[in-house]
């Protein structure tokens, strides 16, 4: 993840062109999206850090951008159970990590934004 120069600075990236091995401590962007050809697109962007996994010799990602997804843009009828579960799990993590640092008003907003789908 870049600063000032380019949003996608190397050395590492998750792409077909990526030829640099990931190492613990590297920060990347996770950008799943959908694009309707010739019309519109939507993308969710979170920053992730590479961390050692509990299983020796493996790596995993930890999301470090903690912001709820805008529920107004989610059509639950288009999601399968695993996708709903992922969003609910993500929102629980966002709430648990952020709410201790917020004012009562902000905490109330976050609780509503992070409620299960």
Which residues make up each language-model segment?
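Charged, cofactor-coupling segments
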Residues: 3-117
